[in-house]
């Protein structure tokens, strides 16, 4: 996000480096079948991998109830975007204005929460923990910037 980037710039000027590891993006880059959306299979599997009791399975079959909250001419394309003549336009608004249950897997139909399993979550979380560990070892060797 812009705020994290600004903090990173500030820290760099002070002689430090910020590394922002977005696990949900990296997981899909490491294994394309894990790529997902907000409230989709990827996030649901991650929660199942930690504690399956946290998932309300009775809601997994519910439809998303996506609304074109801005207008029919500007249909919802994602959480923050609407579609206009094939292009995505960002219009920041609360997720509840788009969907009642918080799921936004439309546009990412390969990632419905119904596909999530505990085994997927455990494998993904273990893979990401190993990746983050390996990154930390490599990042620890990076020379800090010189303060100007």
Regions found by a protein language model. Give the residues of each.
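Extended, histidine- and acidic-residue-enriched regions that form the cofactor-binding/catalytic faces
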Residues: 1-148
